[in-house]
Amino acid sequence: MITSSDVSTIRAQVRSWRSQGESVAFVPTMGNLHQGHITLVKEAKLRAKHVVVSIFVNPMQFGQHEDLDAYPRTLAADSQALIDAGAALLFTPTAQTIYPKGLQQQTFVEVPEIGDVFCGASRPGHFRGVATIVCKLFNIVQPDIALFGRKDFQQLLVIKHMVNDLSLGIDIIGIDTIREASGLAMSSRNGYLTPEQKHTAATIKRALDLIANAVRQGEAIDKATAEGEAMIVQAGFKLDYLSVCNADNLHPAQADDKQLVILVAAYLGTTRLIDNLCFSR
């Protein structure tokens, strides 16, 4: 695996592959890799000749009081995991490389409406940061396909909308959430949880299953959502949001919507966890 923090090196390597007619997949990450990330890389290997991975803790997507400085940096372990998973190229830019003029003078990308609700409302500017860095990385790497986990469902939709709106010509592929045996969605932020909190955190998935099963059986969405909310709050969470939505546009679910997604964000102690569950009725 080649590792570089230099944009021109990354571009030259991708051009070399393309000159030989070889396909390129891309998996952008913030590092501190877990099995969910490794699954993305392995899935990418099934779909393209070469896999490029980026590791960049993006300051633009962190709010003023969020955990940018505390976010774990584990480059040595991440590099070995990516070698084992079959990645061909690792891009590790610095903030100076990505934002040479600083965040305030940086051109940005903003995806309206779908980026303004849920996590977009709770974390103002977050999806501007996500869309901007992903767009910039896409322009550097210029992959055929890019893979993202469905755990960050709203993020996945934001990126799909951006790619479509800006005619970037990249196929965006969502990969199912990887979960621990308890049902807890794998996340880098799980590392902030105590063992007891990790046990409690599995309640989120149970609440999502409860809501989905109730709605499938004909229960009113408001009633099912209230039951799920009670389960989450009683377990000790501070709920940010819990909503059943149209899976295509994140509008509140209507009676004739068939493809639905339940979105949830909640705090356990100081750790904010998100999850979702897609289902049809």
Swiss-Prot record:
The entry's keywords: ATP-binding, Cytoplasm, Ligase, Nucleotide-binding, Pantothenate biosynthesis
A GO term, aspect molecular function: pantoate-beta-alanine ligase activity
Active-site residue numbers: 37
E.C. numbers: 6.3.2.1
Binding site for ATP: 30-37, 149-152, 178, 186-189
Annotated localization: Cytoplasm
GO BP terms, alphabetized: pantothenate biosynthetic process
Keyword Ligase in record: yes
A Pfam family the protein falls into: Pantoate_ligase
Enzyme class at the top of the EC tree: ligase
Stored InterPro entries: Cyt_trans-like, Pantoate_ligase, Pantoate_ligase_C, Rossmann-like_a/b/a_fold
Cross-referenced CDD domains: PanC
Binding residues for (R)-pantoate: 61, 155
Pathway terms, separated by semicolons: Cofactor biosynthesis; (R)-pantothenate biosynthesis; (R)-pantothenate from (R)-pantoate and beta-alanine: step 1/1
Family: Belongs to the pantothenate synthetase family.
Note: The reaction proceeds by a bi uni uni bi ping pong mechanism.
Function: Catalyzes the condensation of pantoate with beta-alanine in an ATP-dependent reaction via a pantoyl-adenylate intermediate.
Oligomeric and partner information: Homodimer.
Protein name, per record: Pantothenate synthetase
